């Protein structure tokens, strides 16, 4: 698949290191949780989760994302996709819990909106380092009740999303959707397992991608061999039992890197 040319029509600064780039067309069939391969001309092609049908939300962390931050309205980049498996939508009347940390809120914001539209009662636990780093709080609030946690206590509960979850009755939820830094995801995974609600959960994983379509095997998960780009990036909690989650990932050479 050749990249589509995406012209930037609007840039929102969500925080000093996070921006949302809106482009001039929509992925009408996008499932919340799917990703696109973003071709930053002259630099690299990198995977990004969609934060709406016509936007990606980018955290400045490396060469490719730094180059994206140099782009202005009217500039363009290439897009391939959407790829992968997104989050499963709830049925009408079901109760959904969303657990979002940092830039992991980006793919979960459209999921919250879609779940609400499907007739689900939506609750969100939204975490970040500080109040200024909270992403899409308004979008989550429009979908339902929001619980906030910040590392520094500048808003909501001081601590992590797991501190909020400890005080919630998780048995009342029919579906639980999780996305965020892997250290957060692994902590949530253990908590959900201990509370015996893991079978209700889905997690979005980040791994190094090369092809983005399941051919190269660079993003396979030990021990199952599931491909994050093709079989994921969203997996059920049960699928991730006895996996590498929270332990290590692989770099571009395939070498294990401790998380």
UniProtKB/Swiss-Prot annotation:
GO terms for molecular function: 2 iron, 2 sulfur cluster binding; electron transfer activity; flavin adenine dinucleotide binding; metal ion binding; oxidoreductase activity. Residues 1-89 form the FAD-binding FR-type domain. SUPFAM superfamilies: Ferredoxin reductase-like, C-terminal NADP-linked domain, Riboflavin synthase domain-like. [2Fe-2S] cluster binds at residues 211, 216, 219, 229. Pathway: Pyrimidine metabolism; UMP biosynthesis via de novo pathway; orotate from (S)-dihydroorotate (NAD(+) route): step 1/1. Binds 1 [2Fe-2S] cluster per subunit. Binds 1 FAD per subunit. Keywords: 2Fe-2S, Electron transport, FAD, Flavoprotein, Iron, Iron-sulfur, Metal-binding, Pyrimidine biosynthesis, Transport. It holds the Pfam family NAD_binding_1. PROSITE patterns: 2FE2S_FER_1, FAD_FR. CDD domains: DHOD_e_trans_like2. One of its GO terms (biological process) is 'de novo' UMP biosynthetic process. Its cofactor is [2Fe-2S] cluster; FAD. Belongs to the PyrK family. NCBIfam families: PRK00054.1-1. PANTHER family: DIHYDROOROTATE DEHYDROGENASE B (NAD(+)), ELECTRON TRANSFER SUBUNIT (PTHR43513), DIHYDROOROTATE DEHYDROGENASE B (NAD(+)), ELECTRON TRANSFER SUBUNIT-RELATED (PTHR43513:SF3). Responsible for channeling the electrons from the oxidation of dihydroorotate from the FMN redox center in the PyrD type B subunit to the ultimate electron acceptor NAD(+). Heterotetramer of 2 PyrK and 2 PyrD type B subunits. This is Probable dihydroorotate dehydrogenase B (NAD(+)), electron transfer subunit. It comes from Methanosarcina barkeri (strain Fusaro / DSM 804).
């Amino acid at each position: 698949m050749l990249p589509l040319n995406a012209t930037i029509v609007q840039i929102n600064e969500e925080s000093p290191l996070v921006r949302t780039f809106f482009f001039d067309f929509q992925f009408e069939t996008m499932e919340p949780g799917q990703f696109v391969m973003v071709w930053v001309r002259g630099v690299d092609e990198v995977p990004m989760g969609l934060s709406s049908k016509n936007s990606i939300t980018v955290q400045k962390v490396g060469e490719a994302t730094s180059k994206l931050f140099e782009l202005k309205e009217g500039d363009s980049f290439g897009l391939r996709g959407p790829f992968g498996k997104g989050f499963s939508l709830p049925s009408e009347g079901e109760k959904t819990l969303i657990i979002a940390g940092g830039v992991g809120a980006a793919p979960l914001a459209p999921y919250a909106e879609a779940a609400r539209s499907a007739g689900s009662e939506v609750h969100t636990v939204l975490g970040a380092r500080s109040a200024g780093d909270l992403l899409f709080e308004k979008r989550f609030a429009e979908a339902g009740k929001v619980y906030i946690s910040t590392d520094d206590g500048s808003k909501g509960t001081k601590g992590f999303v797991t501190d909020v979850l400890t005080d919630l009755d998780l048995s009342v939820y029919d579906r639980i959707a999780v996305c965020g830094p892997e250290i957060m995801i692994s902590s949530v995974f253990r908590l959900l397992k201990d509370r015996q609600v893991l079978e209700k959960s889905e997690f979005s994983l980040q791994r190094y991608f090369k092809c983005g379509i399941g051919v190269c095997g660079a993003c396979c998960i030990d021990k199952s061999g599931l491909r994050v780009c093709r079989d994921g990036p969203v997996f059920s909690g049960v699928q991730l039992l006895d996996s590498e989650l929270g332990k290590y990932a692989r770099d571009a050479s395939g070498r294990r890197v401790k998380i």
